[in-house]
Amino acid sequence: EMATIGHIETSDTILNKVLKNAWWGIYGNYKGMPVDCPQRNERQPWLGDRTVGSLGESFVFYNERLYSKWMHDICDAQRSDGNIPDVAPAFWNYYTDDVTWPAALPFTCDMLYHQFGNRQPIIDSYPSIRKWINHILAEYTDENGIITKDKYGDWCVPPEKLELIHSQDPKRKTDGKLIATAYTIRCLQLAEQFANLQGLKEEAKVWADRRSGMIEAFNRQFLTNKAGTSRRPGHVLYPDSIYYGNNTSTANLLALSFGIAPLELRSELIKQVVKGICIDAKEHVNCGVIGISWLLRGLSDNGFPDVAYLLATQRTYPSWGYMAENGATTIWELWNGDKADPKMNSGNHVMLLGDLLTWCYQYLGGIQQKGVNVQQVAEADASVAYKHIVLKPAISIQNCESVKADYETPYGVVKSQWKKTLQHVDWDITVPCNTTADVYLPDGKVETVGSGDYHYSVEIPTRDAAILKDEFLYDYSGFPSAHASTITQLKNGDLVAAYFGGTFERNPDVCIWVSRKPKGAKAWEKPILAADGVYRLGTPEAKKAGLSGIDEKTTPADKGPIKDGLRRFGVPAGYKYDFRSKSANIKLPANLKRKSCWNPVLYTMPDGEIWLFYKVGSTVGDWTGCLVKSKDGGKTWSDPEALPDGFLGPIKNKPEMVNGRLICGSSTEKNGWRFHVEILDLKTNKWKYVGPVDAELKPRTDDVDSATVDMEHPIYKEGEKARLIYSIQPSILKLKDGRLQVLMRTHNAKLATSFSSDGGDTWTPVTLLDIENNQSGTDAVTLKDGRHVLIYNNFETLPGTKKGSRTPLSLAISDDGTHWRHLLTLEDSPINQYSYPGIIEGKDGKLHCIYTWRRQRVAYKEVDLKKIK
């Protein structure tokens, strides 16, 4: 038995399952030495599996003796010429003269010293390390100063086809010479540290000089540096052409993690890594064994712990969570272990853990050491064996709500347990005897404390002083995805928000949900089901439920939640629907069918009644406009009523009341994007349809070449590329001269606008404004002082593309509705997406902003314009 010395639990259930699987995988592969896969006739102590993995394992198990013994095994297996095998003890004759696998010797010696304070493995192994490095330098350094020998590359990178074991795509492969040279540079750095530790100053200088020379050679050989080439300068997903090798994440991570990259280039290099993950890999892991060893720490070290957390909690392929979601109880050898060729496909292999465990303890738990960065590069006076602890959890990760971590250092147990909202954290720590700790608080303060137990209750500053409240409408809900939010304020100051939520947009289980925040409350109330898309066949309501109708082939009603099912349809009171299993506990009659719900819009009528407009349909072209009402501040909602045939109501953004008429900005998408207005006369209760409104001819971004520089060139006013401005989802402004103005989403990289001088009955042809649009929804509001505020993604869609990035999300302000300036950034993480916002001005002049947060939740911010600098 080997003692478990570390425990960690997070607010994410899938990550917790992965951590449990990691424990079992490591535990099952300790057999007097660290070995691999028990199910095939191998069971070998591969060095490369533990080059970095031993550090993560040391947070979980008391493995000092096992790894100290293994260092002797490796040294004993070394050949007389300095060659260290890939497997030690050398049961197999695998002396390939690789760098990354034998690097386990110096890397693990370093781990044993810093984690446990045991310097003896360094002293005992140093002659072998010296001999091995000199052998590599002598045999495999070419005329350019590059190490040419590499066996495995970035082993087991996620392949382009699930049945493959290894990728055949050259874009996914990292140059073996780059990997070997980078690891040699790191080993030279460790050799320098080991020499200094033993007082071998002259030898340390030799290692330092060789490392310096090899860094210069590495940058000459592998660095591309073309500054000023970004298509969107400053945007994290559009870096300059500055990268290493063929721009794999692994190549750039090694340069960043091993101190190779020039300081002035680090910000662009990490952007390349982030772009590779968020855009090219669609927010998934894109590394093999080498890159994954540095991925999470590399992201966090360089300002992107949120991207690291995204990868750590991802559930789909390729990810650790994908393994756990598909039956794994340990860690697979391959990212696609459930689909790949069984010739090399272990179900119990720990090499792909990379730096996950280390990152969880050091970043989520925040348990680090003074003077030792997360790559274990130590300063001269660095802490050893946690004599001086650093407690610095990544509390800035918005969707990580809590962490409980403890780790038994040689001095005793250190604990770090925290729970937070976006603006407040409660944090309990324990500092063991005979140690000190630097405690990094989220408000910027740092306290140095001695041994003992401490509790901190600290406010978390928002990203700008003008943001008074930063909240999620809910932490957890039954539905996994939410989108298209809207907000209104009642006369008593209560806030009511609505959004659609379900498996994902278009899924028939998507319903309309409402969240309330009473005035003075600290948190939003639990989501309320306000409307569904359920109908009974043969009823007038079903007949109106979409252009394609509802019939026997339509999705059964028990494929989603039902509002007031007992009263409306006689559904048993105990009916429940589970989004995860996509099943209900009760089978419903076959004549009950459902369609998806879309785009809610809230409006508080003059008498205080809340109207909630929404749409029902299988697709956008199938929409039927619907309405539910609430007389009790959004606590309960009426049965749905369909709008008159052909009317959809306000399509995304709030309407405006003008002279007793409700002016609803609307649009259609069935035969091209066309803007129109729907007007409800409250006296007569009759609807009027205005439009579709004419538009100018302009080129769309997806119709022009990617090299296009000037989309206003006269050539685009004629010919096949000159099309009507397609515009949808208008928001309505009230101008100082009495006119109405709409702002709209387009395909043209700019927002569109139109004006009405007669209260909405007629509108000018649609034109473009000089303010960017990413082909995503916006909202705007006219303030009491006559100014206007826009909430939008301030990203201009690139020529040759259909849509732009849905990050950042910002506010802009205008005096006249035509000329706008950027005011405040609300979100700027590279993780997609922050979109479909809503905005209102509160009774006290504060702005209430609401928006989709990564399609997972709905976020809310209260903004005080007076505090914007």
Regions found by a protein language model. Give the residues of each.
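Well-ordered alpha-helical scaffold segments within catalytic/enzyme domains
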Residues: 52-63, 105-121, 183-201, 253-264, ...
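Asp-box/BNR beta-propeller blade signature and adjacent active/binding-site loops
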Residues: 128, 148, 157-162, 171, ...
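Helix-terminus loop motifs that line ligand-binding clefts
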Residues: 63-166, 173, 316-337, 516-546, ...
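Active/binding-pocket-proximal capping segment
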Residues: 74, 78, 128-131, 210-214, ...
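Extracellular polysaccharide-recognition and catalytic grooves
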Residues: 225, 243-338, 343-344, 770, ...
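Solvent-exposed loop and edge beta-strand segments that line ligand/cofactor-binding
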Residues: 34-47, 90-102, 161-183, 220-252, ...
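Non-catalytic C-terminal accessory modules of carbohydrate-active enzymes
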Residues: 306-461
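Active-site acid/base region of carbohydrate-active enzymes
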Residues: 3-21, 27-30, 34-52, 56-85, ...
